[in-house]
């Protein structure tokens, strides 16, 4: 079938901010889809609220709207643009839910707008738990015993009928939001209540648990002519019971017999045909390991997280194909862009093994509940490729950028036996390391299988690696043992640990004996057809398939897995750096380990190496490619941390030198620079012992800001108000050394701001000053920010510009840098300097039109700012107002305190743009799904000492019709000042009743000292999040919301 000519203009719905369950994979799929539609000649409109994406670049679609993803906002854009059709299946669950909601308003029928790809009936049939169960029964496909419920009592009643354990699956949610496994009535009442509240249709499926079955995923495609094919079959290392987003996954499947594979494949294809899905679809199946019995778990009728993984694992661009299918093309008409000779209907074949491991945020949230179940908790993931499953697993572990670089964990090694077995029986994020430890202690495969229900095949992979560890440790500097270990993915650092030497010595010995990796190509067809894909992975094997070209090359280091503090913003900068390198006439090479991102789309760079971002793996690529130099400024702290090791190995670091990168992080050197430039900074001291930290704090005076050096995202950063709190901080953050000291700064009250600047060594371009809406003490990544600034006069701006110019030149910055300031008593103080791209680069780039990463890259490559047409100083401010708002995933992470602090907690961001500050704020709040009705009900729970600051806010809310609720200690103060209290709430149970009944629309909680889990302030915050009620812990955020509500309020005025 040829592509459709009756439609010309297509609106694509993006996925919005990154949250747990919906991350960078949708930037990748949305970008692919928009470009595919433009390639076919269609006019495209993109709507997305997330500025930190490649998808929202103006060249990706004909019309780009960075607007809230709400029915109201989309309706306005649809009436403005009049598209012929909407493509909703590339925006994750948000895209699907919006398509359903838009249809229910009648707008699509009114304007004659068609939904492309999967039709509404199919979406409904796949997403509505009851309808899906009915369809499975019609098709004769087995599903676990289940019942759809709309109340908690119905859920408990069914659990009694079928027996515990049961799984709760809310309808129309993603990442298992609100779901969980329940073992008794108490757990059922808690989980079902939460699931029903989070389901947009107040519906859950209660399902008899089949935990322990093998979990198999098929990524399948179908077109309008009913051609179907399997892109990839993936097998979860973890059995059913752990959300697939929190599972280790292998591709292709590792343990299925041909009979099992064909049986499950037939089921997957039957389902996509029955649902009449046009495009990509993810089918999840559970297989009884003791028989040929299986159950259908669910179908995602859209491009998903697994689609991105399958695309990168096979090289088959699922989202691109899905977009082309949506406009009428069929699989037998679309050329495979990898081989350029075969068609899209040919199923990919893999002659390698891929391993995905999730990246969890528990290094940031040490108090969080780390248990894994049916609700996803990972913020991102890594992927590794090897010739064996062992090699892929080892490479994936070291891609995670956590304390463990292999399967050895000191914590697991010292754990008592009962703790070890508990960790296996009740899985947490670190189960893999405890699993390895059981084999070191002599457990059999059967014993570990009984504890974990993990397939003996996967257990044997871990056991084999432990056995190889033992062999290695007894044969230091043995060439044959070295070769074997490298084939199974052992790093030089791991071998060095086992040989009691340094990784440099292992590398030297390896090179002397010519034990070197080769690089293999990903070609989708296991070399069956000719292919020249520039997409490679390393292996200790024969025949190198990556040939160095004569063209000079530049290597760009990516940022690895998405995590809190290092999100998709850094991938955005990486991709734009690649574009600038290519336009400058160089070959652009990328190393990255993240399957979700645009930078790991092999069509973006000239060569892509899917490798761990470790010194060894990067040096191996450099040995082969011999690039002119390496750019580390756009890969976040991941790339910066590699700079010193690379430089010591003779690698040319382009842009700011390693010594100058260190100058910004070394407290003594930096302090001297500030003094020499006659600039101001808060009084600060450095300490390398616990006692020295306490003395420094006493010398400066409380409150103080304490943090380790060399961190990203404010990890382990805290404001402490007395010695007791400082002692507690030091107990929780014990790792303090001469090389990595603790920094202690005076805490200044004032307005924070930040700038991103580009310096060529002489001139300094400042695209804009971003004012933080929250005062000092909230991490910049968790602060709302406004550009242009709303509260700085020309003198303050001049001080900021002068300080930026002086610092950039003095620190010998060549490229990009970020500086954070605080304005205290009309004076500008420097808080910190980051000699790299920051998370605000996409935000400012979208607003100003300056592609900052590209401009900085050209500077790094030797082109001055003047030659690029830029003048020194602050770029002219726009007429429009732009607000960036953080987005959090607290509802996915039990026991994480939501009180905003110097340590970053947000997972994503949105942007609001309009002609006034209040309108821009309104859009930002709306995009972040903070929607408080006019004339609503507000609960104030206030820290002692905050009453004076809170009082005027409460009065203003009351004046525009809001009902005020308080705790007893706040009530008397409010009453004394003439504020009517609608109700006093005296305990947490009373609050829970009101929250459940929908009687509270916003909770304001400033009880910062209540961080213990049994404290009132903490419990109030947890209850508020559990009920999905907006929560604000900063009075500056409250004031911003109040400005919006006052702007929207109509005042009743008497005639005088």
From Swiss-Prot:
UniProt-recorded name of the protein: Carbamoyl phosphate synthase large chain
Pathway assigned to this chain's UniProt record: Amino-acid biosynthesis; L-arginine biosynthesis; carbamoyl phosphate from bicarbonate: step 1/1; Pyrimidine metabolism; UMP biosynthesis via de novo pathway; (S)-dihydroorotate from bicarbonate: step 1/3
This protein's encoding gene: carB
Domain of life: Bacteria
Residue ranges, annotated region (Carboxyphosphate synthetic domain): 1-401
Binding of Mg(2+) 3, residues: 820, 832
Binding-site list for Mn(2+) 4: 832, 834
One of the protein's GO biological processes: glutamine metabolic process
Catalyzed reactions per annotation: hydrogencarbonate + L-glutamine + 2 ATP + H2O = carbamoyl phosphate + L-glutamate + 2 ADP + phosphate + 2 H(+)
Organism per entry: Limosilactobacillus reuteri (strain DSM 20016)
Cofactor(s) demanded: Mg(2+); Mn(2+)
């Amino acid at each position: 079938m040829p592509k459709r000519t009756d439609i010309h203009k297509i609106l694509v719905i993006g996925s919005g901010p990154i949250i747990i369950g919906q991350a960078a994979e949708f930037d990748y799929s949305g970008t692919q889809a928009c470009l595919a539609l433009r390639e076919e000649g269609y006019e495209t409109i993109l709507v997305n609220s997330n500025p930190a994406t490649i998808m929202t670049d103006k060249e990706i679609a004909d019309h780009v709207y960075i607007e809230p993803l709400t029915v109201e906002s989309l309706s306005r854009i649809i009436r403005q643009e009049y598209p012929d059709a909407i493509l909703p299946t590339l925006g994750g669950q948000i895209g699907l839910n919006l398509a359903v909601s838009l249809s229910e308003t009648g707008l699509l029928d009114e304007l004659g707008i068609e939904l492309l790809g999967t039709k509404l009936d199919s979406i409904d049939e796949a997403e509505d738990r009851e309808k899906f169960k009915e369809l499975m029964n019609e098709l004769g496909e087995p599903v676990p015993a289940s019942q759809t419920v709309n109340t908690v009592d119905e859920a408990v009643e069914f659990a009694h009928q079928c027996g515990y354990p049961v799984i709760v699956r809310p309808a129309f949610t993603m990442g298992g939001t609100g779901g969980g496994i329940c073992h008794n009535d108490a757990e059922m009442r808690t989980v079902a209540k939460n699931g029903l509240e989070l389901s947009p249709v107040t519906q859950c499926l209660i399902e008899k648990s089949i935990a322990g079955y093998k979990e198999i995923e098929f990524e399948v495609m179908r077109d309008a002519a009913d051609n179907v094919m399997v892109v990839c079959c993936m097998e979860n290392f973890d059995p059913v019971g752990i959300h697939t987003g929190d599972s280790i996954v292998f591709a292709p499947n590792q343990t299925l017999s041909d009979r099992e594979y064909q049986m499950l494949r037939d089921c997957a294809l039957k389902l996509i045909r029955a649902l009449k899905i046009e495009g990509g679809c993810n089918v999840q199946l559970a297989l009884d390991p003791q028989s040929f019995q299986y159950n259908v778990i669910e179908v995602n009728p859209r491009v998903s997280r697994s689609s991105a993984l399958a695309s990168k694992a096979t090289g088959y661009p699922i989202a691109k194909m899905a977009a082309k299918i949506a406009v009428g093309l069929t699989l037998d008409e679309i050329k495979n862009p990898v081989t350029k000779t075969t068609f899209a209907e040919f199923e990919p074949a893999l002659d390698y093994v891929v391993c995905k491991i999730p990246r969890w945020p528990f290094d940031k949230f040490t108090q969080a509940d780390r248990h894994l179940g049916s609700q996803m908790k990972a913020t991102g993931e890594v992927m590794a490729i090897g010739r064996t499953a062992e090699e892929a697993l080892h490479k994936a572990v070291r891609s995670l950028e956590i304390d463990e670089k292999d399967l050895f964990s000191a914590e697991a090694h010292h754990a008592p036996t009962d703790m070890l077995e508990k960790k296996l029986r009740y899985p947490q994020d670190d189960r893999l390391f405890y699993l390895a430890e059981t084999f070191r202690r002599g457990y059999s495969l059967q014993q570990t299988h009984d504890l974990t229900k993990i397939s003996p095949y996967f257990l044997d992979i871990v056991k084999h690696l432990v056995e190889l560890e033992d062999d290695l440790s007894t044969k230091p500097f043995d060439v044959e043992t070295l070769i074997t270990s490298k084939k199974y993915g052992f790093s030089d650092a791991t071998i060095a640990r086992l040989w009691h030497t340094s990784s440099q010595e292992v590398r030297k010995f390896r090179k002397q004996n010519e034990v070197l990796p080769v690089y293999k190509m990903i070609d989708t067809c296991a070399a069956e057809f000719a292919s020249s894909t520039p997409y490679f992975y390393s292996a200790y094997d024969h025949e190198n398939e990556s040939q160095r070209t004569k063209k000079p090359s530049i290597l760009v280091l990516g940022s690895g897995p998405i995590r809190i503090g290092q999100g998709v913003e850094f991938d955005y900068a990486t991709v734009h750096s690649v574009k600038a390198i290519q336009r400058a006439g160089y070959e652009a090479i990328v190393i990255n380990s993240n399957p979700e991102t645009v930078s790991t789309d092999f069509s973006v760079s000239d060569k892509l190496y899917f490798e761990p971002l470790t010194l060894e793996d990067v040096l191996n690529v450099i040995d082969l490619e011999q690039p002119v130099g390496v750019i580390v400024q756009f890969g976040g702290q991941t790339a910066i941390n590699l700079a010193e090791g690379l430089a010591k190995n003779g690698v040319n670091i382009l842009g700011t030198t390693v010594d100058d990168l260190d100058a910004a992080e070394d407290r003594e050197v930096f302090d001297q620079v500030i003094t020499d430039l006659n600039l101001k900074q808060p009084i600060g001291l450095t300490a390398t012992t616990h006692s020295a930290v306490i003395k420094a704090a006493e010398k400066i005076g409380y409150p103080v800001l304490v943090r380790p050096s060399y961190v990203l995202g404010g990890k382990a950063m805290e404001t402490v108000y007395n010695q007791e709190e400082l002692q507690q901080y030091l107990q929780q953050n014990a790792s303090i050394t001469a090389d990595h000291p603790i920094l202690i700064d005076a805490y200044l009250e004032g307005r924070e701001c930040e700038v991103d600047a580009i310096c060529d060594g002489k001139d300094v371009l400042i695209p804009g000053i971003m004012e933080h809406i929250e005062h000092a003490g909230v991490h910049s990544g968790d602060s709302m920010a406004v550009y242009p600034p709303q509260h700085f006069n020309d003198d303050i701006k001049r001080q900021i510009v002068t300080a930026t110019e002086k610092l950039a030149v003095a620190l010998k910055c060549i490229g990009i840098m970020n500086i954070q300031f605080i304005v205290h008593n009309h004076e500008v103080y420097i808080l910190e300097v980051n000699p790299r791209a920051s998370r605000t680069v996409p935000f400012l780039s979208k607003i100003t039109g300056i592609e900052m990463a590209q401009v900085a890259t050209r500077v790094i490559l030797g082109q001055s700012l003047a030659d690029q047409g830029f003048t020194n100083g602050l770029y002219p401010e726009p007429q429009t107002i732009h607000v960036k708002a953080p987005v959090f995933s607290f509802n996915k992470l039990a026991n994480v305190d939501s009180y905003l602090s110097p340590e970053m907690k947000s997972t994503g961001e949105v942007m609001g743009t309009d002609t006034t500050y209040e309108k821009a704020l309104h859009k930002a709040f709306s995009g972040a799904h903070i929607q408080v009705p006019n004339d609503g009900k507000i609960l104030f729970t206030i820290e002692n000492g905050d009453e004076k600051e809170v009082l005027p806010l409460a009065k203003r809310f009351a004046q525009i019709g809001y009902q005020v609720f308080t705790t007893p200690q706040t009530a008397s103060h409010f009453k004394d000042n003439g504020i009517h209290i609608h109700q006093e709430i005296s305990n947490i149970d009373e609050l829970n009743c009101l929250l459940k009944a929908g009687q509270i629309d916003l909770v304001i909680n400033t009880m910062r000292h209540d961080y213990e889990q049994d404290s009132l302030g903490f419990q109030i915050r947890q209850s508020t999040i559990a009920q999905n009620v907006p929560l604000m812990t900063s009075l500056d955020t409250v004031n911003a919301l109040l400005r919006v509500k006052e702007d929207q309020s109509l005042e009743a005025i008497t005639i005088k």
